[in-house]
């Protein structure tokens, strides 16, 4: 290939010294007119141009020009036209014989070249037969080059017309060109060189990485973003516009300075995607071209800075829809195709298009790559596309629409009703003619305004983002129309009345009225949920993903059953105090909140849907509700108007919900942060009345009646399944609740206590308290605390009250039942685990267990308040400190929060599942669903947690051959380690019996034993068995050491320290706080 002739670097005039410019331009002796302006500013060259310079000063030769670019843009159309046509003529002079003759007077340097004479020449030129088919008038010049026309210096910045060259009109003429010719002429690049004053490449780095500072060359002002610099240049006129059409075929033309075309360097596709106006979708060769485009068209004012608009592929009219008479070309890239523009649209519609939305053109080149299914008409019909098909509200961004759909659940309804009708959800719009298209676009695109105002947000789009996470299941199960958002969105519907007449087949409210309104559908879906949960529980398959925190495992479903099963002991207490929510661990009835709780900002909540449901299923419940609403109406009128869902829920003392759902419903459905129920409720409590009706229900309650409301025994068949279903719904959806203030929440404090408290409660079984005594203590307990937020540790002190109710709310009345502190403590733990945090998911198997027991009638298997009540207050205080630091937030060690007893059971079961092969090696076999169910029922661990624990152990054993309690399994000589006493055992059978001695019962009896019997056995056998297992020289001293946190005894201080650090995460230095010495018996 012949070597290219060595040339000086090719530069545009803006960057070349005057001498070089003069020298270079002299070679092109065709256009002496331009030399006059390009050369050194001498009288010889300047005189003939004097008059022209006044009208359109060159920025190079007249630094003190009278007109800024702003003024130039606002010059009359006539002068703009003449100046533009001057540029045009100089650029097309070579190949146009006719124009050469016209040009001759211009080459003469006499004063006769006046502006008027030039105007006449240009008018004559425009009326030339070559241009006749363009039908352009002076106000709409095209400045489009013929493919053959070229000019060697057309990209220089020196011609007189450069200041007022109307880039905007040139671009619009191109983008709106209607090709009626059959032949396609090659089109030069859309926008030729534009010189922005930029700094060295070192300062800027790559175009794509951006710059630390963008400086204006004229005044040296620094800006952080290119947009700010562009705005500044536009306001002050500190820029030069040399947008002249050039022809790529001419080798002598001046190329872009120091900035090789990105189209060559980076590949056309990439460069065009990057250097594209986000507003109108045009691609540019260089950043300078794009910037001047922004300045001239003011598009930078219309592009939202933080959230760029989707590339407007909205404008391409599909070929199928084009009318033959109005064929629009769709070139695939700026350089590929072009042609002589033909203006077939009337001036009126052209002006309309130019003034209202100049960017809506058929020329967007990437529409079909950006998801042509909807994007090709995106910008033009954004208000119709980003529109909720359920309630008709329009949104500015897809994110806002998504948030709206999630919050209101409209996406479920729209999809369902569309499927039922067999309708496609969105149909392709019909755009029959260009004029109608233009009219609709003018109406529907607010972006065309030149001020920096994005389309006005509809009220719906401002709906709180907090609610985005609100449960999809809730929305699925409720097809009740959402009234409030519709009212809020009416203004937006009025703004868009034209949408109704548009050709889009969106679903309307009328369509949705045909879909079922709820009622039986909700029951059916809940029924499905329950049956699938029960099936999963029976099959033993894990329900859903693992627990981020091991605390999520402790859901204690059988303790739930105890509390929920003892519903017979509850009685509808007449509310004697104003604004507290009655939550008792032994009450199961879930009367849905009356409508006064509907003052919340989120109109669609469980309360509303379930209220309607209850009314449909049984009107008797509604009667009960009304009875209870009356006293409430008298007692708490001020609270009823509270808009917060939390407080409006707390304002209803009649909702005696089961502690499993009532106590956290307010958090679950509330977009606002959950309030501390205790703080809110306590000041107005009148605890004197608390114990009044406590004794009455005991006789009937102990007989195992499942009457939810003891005043209305015949109604129980109606209420019980509903309360069960509702508790399913609440617990099932509880994982979506995200309380924002867990620290203020009594539930989170309960969660801290749950692990060790349940253990301690299980240890001893003192005689049961009489009902009267309980009533008295109840009153005393609440008298002490009625004026301040409750101290959660008081439940462990020597008031033998029902712990769960005390913890849940200081004003909640606790019926004196014979259920033990174990029951209530674990129930409160369940509440905190099941409801409080999104981290604590709930497996459906636990729900199914609870449900099975809800519908059966049975008495609670309960022992009585435990030895905790006999402990000293000092003891209680240290326990409080100890338990403050147990949860995972404080301790990061793995498995540190497992209940040690549960671990022992799991490890023993795992060891029992090992099978020895003929070669003497052990292979792991899976636990059967029945075995897992037994463990789950006893420990309260969910099936999912058990499955995950087993899977984790198996994974560790396969990967490393060992885990915490078992090493060397793969060698055939396993070593089992006891978690409690660190002894090492060689065979699975010995290990199992060893662990059973710790546990105090045999694993095979696990399924047969009731919780109480196991607790009794633990209390009886724990100390002796551990003394047998651990031996130490210190034993002779006659002392054993007991861990205060879990009441285990150890023979040596070392063992206790080891236990404290391993099991409870305590520092050995603190062992004095948590260890009590016992005399050897």
UniProtKB/Swiss-Prot annotation:
Keyword Zinc: yes
DNA-binding region: 891-961
Compartment(s) where it occurs, according to its Swiss-Prot or TrEMBL record: Nucleus; Cell projection, Growth cone
Keyword annotations: Cell projection, Coiled coil, Developmental protein, DNA-binding, Homeobox, Metal-binding, Nucleus, Phosphoprotein, Repeat, Repressor, Transcription, Transcription regulation, Zinc, Zinc-finger
One Gene Ontology term from the biological process aspect of the record: positive regulation of synaptic transmission, glutamatergic
Coiled-coil region(s): 606-630
Pfam family, one: zf-C2H2_6
Gene null: resulting phenotype: Mice fail to breathe and die at birth. Display pronounced cell death of motoneurons in the nucleus ambiguus and induce strong alterations of rhythmogenesis in the embryonic parafacial respiratory group (e-pF or pFRG) oscillator and cranial motoneurons that control the upper airways. Mice also fail to form small smooth cells in the proximal ureter and urine flow is impaired because of functional obstruction caused by absent peristalsis in the proximal ureter that leads to hydronephrosis and hydroureter phenotypes.
Molecular function terms, GO-annotated: chromatin binding; DNA binding; zinc ion binding
Region (Disordered): 25-104, 141-161, 238-257, 325-346, 474-499, 626-699, 792-824, 855-897
Induction and repression of expression: Up-regulated by BMP4.
Biased composition (Polar residues): 660-670
UniProt feature, compositional bias: Low complexity: 800-824, 856-869
Organism superkingdom: Eukaryota
Summary of the tissues where the protein is detected: Expressed in corticostriatal neurons.
Bias kind Basic and acidic residues: ranges: 68-87, 238-247, 474-491
Tagged with keyword DNA repair: no
Cellular component annotations (GO), alphabetically ordered: growth cone; mitochondrion; nucleus
Database matches in SMART domains: HOX, ZnF_C2H2
Stored InterPro entries: HD (IPR001356), Teashirt_fam (IPR027008), Znf_C2H2_type (IPR013087)
Stated role: Transcriptional regulator involved in developmental processes. Functions in association with APBB1, SET and HDAC factors as a transcriptional repressor, that inhibits the expression of CASP4. TSHZ3-mediated transcription repression involves the recruitment of histone deacetylases HDAC1 and HDAC2. Associates with chromatin in a region surrounding the CASP4 transcriptional start site(s). Regulates the development of neurons involved in both respiratory rhythm and airflow control.
Family, per entry: Belongs to the teashirt C2H2-type zinc-finger protein family.
Quaternary data: Interacts (via N-terminus) with HDAC1 and HDAC2; the interaction is direct. Found in a trimeric complex with APBB1 and HDAC1; the interaction between HDAC1 and APBB1 is mediated by TSHZ3. Interacts (via homeobox domain) with APBB1 (via PID domain 1).
Name of the protein: Teashirt homolog 3
Organism annotation: Mus musculus (Mouse)
């Amino acid at each position: 290939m012949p070597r290219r002739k060595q040339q000086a670097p090719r530069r545009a005039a803006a960057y070349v010294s005057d001498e070089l410019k003069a020298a270079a331009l002299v070679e092109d002796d065709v256009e002496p007119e331009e030399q006059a302006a390009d050369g050194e500013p001498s009288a010889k060259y300047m005189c003939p141009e004097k008059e022209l310079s006044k009208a359109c000063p060159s920025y190079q030769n007249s630094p003190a020009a009278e007109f800024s670019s702003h003024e130039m843009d606002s010059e009359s159309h006539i002068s703009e036209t003449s100046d533009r046509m001057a540029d045009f003529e100089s650029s097309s002079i070579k190949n146009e014989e006719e124009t050469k003759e016209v040009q001759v007077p211009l080459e003469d340097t006499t004063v006769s070249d006046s502006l008027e004479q030039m105007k006449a020449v240009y008018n004559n030129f425009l009326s030339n037969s070559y241009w006749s088919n363009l039908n352009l008038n002076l106000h709409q010049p095209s400045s489009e080059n013929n493919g053959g026309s070229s000019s060697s210096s057309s990209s220089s910045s020196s011609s007189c017309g450069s200041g007022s060259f109307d880039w905007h009109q040139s671009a619009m003429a191109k983008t709106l060109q209607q090709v009626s010719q059959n032949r396609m002429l090659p089109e030069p690049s859309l926008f030729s060189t534009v010189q922005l004053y930029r700094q060295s490449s070192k300062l800027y780095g790559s175009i794509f990485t951006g710059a630390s500072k963008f400086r204006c060359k004229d005044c040296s002002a620094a800006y952080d973003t290119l947009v700010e610099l562009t705005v500044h240049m536009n306001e002050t006129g500190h820029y030069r516009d040399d947008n002249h059409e050039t022809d790529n075929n001419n080798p002598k033309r001046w190329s872009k300075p120091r900035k090789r075309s990105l189209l060559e360097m980076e590949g056309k596709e990439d460069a065009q995607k990057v250097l594209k106006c986000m507003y109108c979708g045009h691609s540019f060769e260089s950043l300078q071209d794009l910037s001047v485009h922004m300045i001239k068209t003011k598009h930078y004012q219309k592009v939202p800075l933080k959230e760029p608009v989707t590339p407007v592929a909205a404008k391409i009219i599909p070929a199928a829809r084009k009318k033959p008479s109005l064929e629009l070309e769709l070139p695939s890239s700026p350089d590929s195709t072009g042609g002589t523009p033909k203006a077939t649209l009337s001036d009126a519609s052209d002006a309309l298009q130019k003034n209202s939305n100049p960017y809506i053109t058929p020329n967007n080149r990437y529409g079909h790559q950006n998801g042509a299914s909807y994007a090709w008409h995106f910008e033009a019909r954004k208000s119709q596309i980003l529109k909720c098909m359920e309630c008709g509200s329009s949104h500015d961004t897809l994110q806002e629409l998504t948030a709206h759909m999630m919050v209101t659940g409209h996406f479920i309804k729209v999809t369902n009703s569309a499927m039922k009708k067999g309708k496609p959800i969105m149909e392709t719009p019909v755009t029959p003619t260009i004029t109608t298209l233009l009219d609709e676009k003018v109406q529907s695109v607010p972006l065309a305004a030149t001020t920096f105002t994005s389309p006005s947000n509809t009220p719906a789009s401002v709906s709180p983002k907090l609610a985005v996470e609100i449960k999809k299941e809730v929305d699925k199960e409720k097809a009740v129309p959402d009234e409030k958002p519709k009212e809020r969105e009416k203004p937006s519907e009025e703004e868009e009345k034209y949408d109704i007449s548009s050709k889009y087949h969106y679903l309307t409210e009328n369509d949705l009225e045909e879909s079922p309104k709820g009622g039986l559908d909700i029951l059916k879906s809940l029924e499905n949920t329950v049956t699938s949960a029960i099936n999963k529980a029976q099959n033993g398959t894990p329900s859903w993903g693992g627990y981020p925190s091991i605390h999520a495992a402790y859901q204690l479903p059988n303790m739930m059953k105890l509390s929920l099963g003892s519903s017979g002991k509850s009685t509808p207490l007449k509310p004697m105090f104003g604004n507290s929510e009655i939550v008792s661990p032994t009450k199961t009835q879930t009367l849905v909140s009356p409508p006064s709780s509907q003052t919340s900002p989120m109109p669609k909540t469980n309360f509303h849907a379930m209220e309607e449901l209850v009314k449909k299923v049984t009107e008797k419940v509604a009667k009960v509700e009304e009875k209870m609403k009356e006293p409430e109406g008298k007692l708490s009128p001020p609270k009823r108007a509270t808009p917060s869902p939390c407080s409006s829920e707390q304002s209803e003392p009649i909702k005696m919900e089961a502690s499993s759902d009532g106590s956290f419903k307010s958090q679950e459905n509330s977009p606002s942060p959950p309030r501390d129920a205790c703080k809110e409720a306590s000041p107005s409590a009148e605890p004197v009345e608390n114990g009044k009706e406590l004794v009455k229900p005991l006789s009937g309650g102990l007989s195992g009646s499942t009457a939810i409301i003891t005043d209305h025994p015949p109604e129980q068949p109606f209420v019980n399944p509903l309360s069960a279903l509702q508790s399913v719904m609440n617990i099932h959806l509880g994982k979506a609740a995200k309380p924002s203030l867990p620290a203020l929440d009594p539930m989170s404090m309960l969660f801290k206590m749950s692990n060790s408290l349940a253990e301690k409660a299980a240890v001893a079984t003192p005689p049961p308290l009489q009902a009267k005594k309980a009533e008295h203590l109840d009153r005393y307990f609440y008298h002490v605390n009625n004026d301040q937020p409750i101290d959660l540790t008081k439940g462990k002190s020597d008031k033998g009250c029902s712990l769960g109710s005390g913890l849940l709310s200081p004003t909640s009345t606790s019926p004196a039942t014979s259920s033990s502190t174990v029951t209530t403590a674990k129930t409160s733990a369940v509440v905190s685990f099941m409801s409080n945090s999104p981290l604590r998911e709930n497996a459906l198997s636990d729900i199914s267990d609870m449900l099975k027991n809800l519908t059966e009638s049975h008495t609670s298997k309960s022992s009585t308040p435990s030895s905790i009540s006999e402990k000293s207050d000092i003891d209680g205080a240290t326990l409080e400190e100890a338990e403050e630091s147990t949860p995972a937030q404080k301790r990061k060690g793995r498995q540190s929060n497992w209940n040690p007893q549960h671990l022992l059971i799991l490890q023993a079961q795992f060891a029992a599942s090992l099978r020895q092969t003929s070669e003497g090696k052990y292979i792991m076999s899976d636990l059967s669903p029945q075995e897992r169910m037994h463990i789950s029922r006893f420990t309260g661990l969910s099936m999912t947690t058990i499955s995950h624990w087993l899977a984790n152990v198996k994974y560790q054993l396969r990967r490393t051959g060992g885990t915490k309690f078992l090493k060397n399994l793969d060698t055939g000589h396993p070593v089992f380690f006891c978690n409690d006493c660190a002894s090492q055992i060689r065979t699975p059978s010995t290990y199992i019996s060893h662990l059973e001695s710790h546990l105090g019962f045999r694993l095979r009896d696990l399924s047969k034993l009731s919780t109480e019997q196991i607790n009794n056995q633990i209390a009886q056998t724990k100390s002796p068995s551990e003394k047998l297992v651990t031996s130490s020289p210190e034993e002779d001293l006659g002392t054993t050491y007991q861990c205060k946190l879990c009441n285990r005894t150890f023979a040596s201080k070392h063992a206790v320290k080891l236990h404290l650090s391993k099991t409870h995460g305590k520092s050995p230095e603190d062992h004095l706080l948590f260890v009590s010495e016992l005399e050897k018996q």
